[in-house]
Amino acid sequence: MSDYKSTLNLPETGFPMRGDLAKREPGMLARWTDDDLYGIIRAAKKGKKTFILHDGPPYANGSIHIGHSVNKILKDIIIKSKGLSGYDSPYVPGWDCHGLPIELKVEQEYGKPGEKFTAAEFRAKCREYAATQVDGQRKDFIRLGVLGDWSHPYLTMDFKTEANIIRALGKIIGNGHLHKGAKPVHWCVDCRSALAEAEVEYYDKTSPSIDVAFLAVDQDALKTKFGVSNVNGPISLVIWTTTPWTLPANRAISIAPDFDYALVQIDGQAVILAKDLVESVMQRIGVSDYTILGTVKGAELELLRFTHPFMDFDVPAILGDHVTLDAGTGAVHTAPGHGPDDYVIGQKYGLETANPVGPDGTYLPGTYPTLDGVNVFKANDIVIALLQEKGALLHVEKMQHSYPCCWRHKTPIIFRATPQWFVSMDQKGLRAQSLKEIKGVQWIPDWGQARIESMVANRPDWCISRQRTWGVPMSLFVHKDTEELHPRTLELMEEVAKRVEVDGIQAWWDLDAKEILGDEADQYVKVPDTLDVWFDSGSTHSSVVDVRPEFAGHAADMYLEGSDQHRGWFMSSLMISTAMKGKAPYRQVLTHGFTVDGQGRKMSKSIGNTVSPQDVMNKLGADILRLWVASTDYTGEMAVSDEILKRAADSYRRIRNTARFLLANLNGFDPAKDMVKPEEMVVLDRWAVGCAKAAQEDILKAYEAYDFHEVVQRLMRFCSVEMGSFYLDIIKDRQYTAKADSVARRSCQTALYHIAEALVRWMAPILSFTADEVWGYLPGEREKYVFTGEWYEGLFGLADSEAMNDAFWDELLKVRGEVNKVIEQARADKKVGGSLEAAVTLYAEPELAAKLTALGDELRFVLLTSGATVADYNDAPADAQQSEVLKGLKVALSKAEGEKCPRCWHYTQDVGKVAEHAEICGRCVSNVAGDGEKRKFA
């Protein structure tokens, strides 16, 4: 028997079947670094239109987790897809480097500043610690395949950035947005510092719920208001609170002007309550026998005075819009030093902003004899006992409610009035302008707009001062007596900024005021406060984007972070940019959900359901992690588990196998010499290129819309359905058996080449390592890296006017599917082994029959059978299988006649008819020793 294997064009490529990504990716990264791939991309894109995605800085503390990976991978996909879309899209990664978490880490190791180390030495230790954290996180981010200027990231602790943060504050002061006040702020007694809104988390807490009677000073005036004379016992206004410890700071009782308030007679006394809450209050305090003596509107009670239950003063009834009928009594205990609503109404009525609580959460001396020095959370029982003793306690019970806690310590926090610096939301119209700016931004998903609008509309003034050691100094001088800012504040801040730019923030603490104030130095003091770290990161649009040369003065097009950043970085950036420049710092804001496990549970070390990105990369490779991110709808929670990652790995194999098939069959193809013109190509090959063109249109649209899961789905459909189960199957016969240099084969290779050129680019933003690997095996002259180019523009398709247009082949796909069903059944029944052992007759109605007949003898190649004939639908025998998809089609199968050709494996009647090649069929003889077969359609 002759060996005809050597006459076949068998696929051959050095591109490995197995990805072995965990082993192979580090080598690629080393090459990218050695070549300065990021620099090559920047040079290639120079002068193009820009797209700037500004990196929200992760905090420089701890290893990266799966959420960090999601964030950086999404950014990288966008940057790379924008590059392929013709944009110059630089990526400058950043880190947030100041603040409490770093201080706490350094304290754990070295103690608090002033104990073993001076404050200056402590700051130096903080800077060292942050630098080591940046280095660790940077290695992991690079390992993810994220391309960026990793050698020159921005750090909020860079001297120049620290200086520019001071300048940003100066601009805000110059625009009139800063004010000082003793105002209640979120205060953590463990941190001994004010907290930003974004540093507050809510947990369930059990607190005492109490109803307290405030005795009326002028009993007769109240009787007159309610139009009654016969009242049994004293009259009180009743408040309800879950924070008894705040009662020493009570300075008023708030009621609603339009609510009806009832005077209710109970045993031995009368109480004033909101009429709509009388029944629920009576049930709560256990009173069944009561009488409503009269009602008045809340406005009638304004400025009537009531005796504080245990402090030696009385307080007014005041009118407030914050009073509701949701719970309580309709009268609200008001302590301006312990709550933002209380503070606002207190300002309106000129109330004292009393703050009897020290920074450590204990009452200050002189508050009340039994309370001085007591922790406020331990004081509730003392206050309740006092109320009981004074006869003012109507009811007490325990209740569980959501309570604000410190994000770092997870301990309850308090509202505490302290002298702080604020960015005002309203004194210069910052709130109104911010709300206007929000409308000009594209929010992705669109619900982000309503979310941040609500937050801006309702947020208090922003407390930007902190009493910390490791932070950017506010760099302010205030008068010793008046506490007013120095009249040359902006000029002085610029002088400080220049020094910080040279020596870092320590320059402020080393600064002797005389150096820049001269003779005035004795009249002014340096403000010791540092800036909220959210001010650091929130001002990077100014301190980084506006000054980095690669951004060339362009504002950021996009901010992209987790959905918690509406109240974090998106908010602080919007506030600062609007206060500085009157406009938003971004054009688009994209948010992604949090990662959860396969059961939808939050990631938790205690549950043991965390997924380490480092483990995934070491086991499966970064491309699998990237594919999981891209294939998950990031607009909601993003589920990840070993099983989910395994599915991503399965999808990866399908894409890799498709790429490998293309490369293996491009063996020996030189596009410069072997390319077939579109008009001379086999029709099916043109259809395949057209499929790629249609897929590319969908994929590019999805990239443009940031719908990456749609990119993956479309890519998978192209690889699995249009290519894998149809086109690539059909062309194997022609590719392997036709003459090597025949039009039939070169046409096929031309199609595969166009498809591969497109496919590798579709993959590149997501499967960056694999795309780089594929790129290295593609034939023809090309740039060194896929990332420097643009989307492939060599695709074309069939014209609708052609007889065998896309609709024709779509119908052939369905016919092929129906034939496959019949063949599978015949294989199950042991009638045939493989499809080439079968011959089929297609009984079709005239319109379909005409299409099938048009393919002539090439129909069998489309169906992967040794024989295929077309007959009239009405002539179908009883055992012909009716198609469920195509009503005008029945399929009958028989065993193919003739002998099996050992070269092409088709069964034909002409095997052995040519004496010189007695073992093979006539078609193979032509391909081996003759002019070669001609293919027109398939």
Swiss-Prot record:
Localisation per UniProt entry: Cytoplasm
CDD domains in alphabetical order: Anticodon_Ia_Ile_BEm, IleRS_core
PROSITE patterns (alphabetical): AA_TRNA_LIGASE_I
GO biological process: isoleucyl-tRNA aminoacylation
Keywords associated with the record: Acetylation, Aminoacyl-tRNA synthetase, ATP-binding, Cytoplasm, Ligase, Metal-binding, Nucleotide-binding, Protein biosynthesis, Zinc
Chain residues that bind Zn(2+): C901, C904, C921, C924
Domain of life of the source: Bacteria
Binding site for L-isoleucyl-5'-AMP: E561
Keyword Acetylation part of the UniProt annotation: yes
Residue numbers covered by motif 'KMSKS' region: 602-606
Record-listed E.C. numbers: 6.1.1.5
Cofactor(s) for this UniProt protein: Zn(2+)
GO CC field: cytosol
List of residues binding ATP: K605
Enzyme class (EC, first level): ligase
Cofactor note: Binds 1 zinc ion per subunit.
Catalysis: reaction(s): tRNA(Ile) + L-isoleucine + ATP = L-isoleucyl-tRNA(Ile) + AMP + diphosphate
Main location: cytoplasm
Gene Ontology molecular function: aminoacyl-tRNA deacylase activity; ATP binding; isoleucine-tRNA ligase activity; tRNA binding; zinc ion binding
Modified residues (N6-acetyllysine): K183
Span of the annotated motif 'HIGH' region: 58-68
UniProt record similarity statement: Belongs to the class-I aminoacyl-tRNA synthetase family. IleS type 1 subfamily.
Role noted for this protein: Catalyzes the attachment of isoleucine to tRNA(Ile). As IleRS can inadvertently accommodate and process structurally similar amino acids such as valine, to avoid such errors it has two additional distinct tRNA(Ile)-dependent editing activities. One activity is designated as 'pretransfer' editing and involves the hydrolysis of activated Val-AMP. The other activity is designated 'posttransfer' editing and involves deacylation of mischarged Val-tRNA(Ile).
Domain-level remarks: IleRS has two distinct active sites: one for aminoacylation and one for editing. The misactivated valine is translocated from the active site to the editing site, which sterically excludes the correctly activated isoleucine. The single editing site contains two valyl binding pockets, one specific for each substrate (Val-AMP or Val-tRNA(Ile)).
UniProt subunit comment: Monomer.
Name of the protein in question: Isoleucine--tRNA ligase
Phylogenetic placement of the source organism: Bacteria, Pseudomonadati, Pseudomonadota, Gammaproteobacteria, Enterobacterales
Gene that produces this protein: ileS
